[in-house]
């Protein structure tokens, strides 16, 4: 089995486990990008604690689910967005205004679209969570 997009696979796995009602999910393979996306989700209150477990290969993330995710997924292709262009993508990927977050990769790191707006940054869209 080969993974074409580990981030999309991880978010889909989280969404499926949340829908079934599991409390803990193990994500493998782990990567720095997945870790940063999980950190943004944790900072915004969508997941509980997560930890990296070394397994001798790429590693595994153990994520505690708290039942706050309705849907999450990767955005493909990774659209570039300017600092004033978030509203178009909010309408496309989020169900309502001020409900959910878009996760953006900027020059200053991975962050939510709200934080990127405050800092006046553009970037590439990675994922959505609500």
Curated annotation (Swiss-Prot):
It comes from the Archaea. GO terms for biological process: translation. Pfam families: Ribosomal_S8. Disulfide bonds: none annotated. GO terms for molecular function: rRNA binding; structural constituent of ribosome. GO terms for cellular component: cytosolic small ribosomal subunit. One of the primary rRNA binding proteins, it binds directly to 16S rRNA central domain where it helps coordinate assembly of the platform of the 30S subunit. Belongs to the universal ribosomal protein uS8 family. Part of the 30S ribosomal subunit. This is Small ribosomal subunit protein uS8. It comes from Methanocaldococcus jannaschii (strain ATCC 43067 / DSM 2661 / JAL-1 / JCM 10045 / NBRC 100440). The gene is rps8.
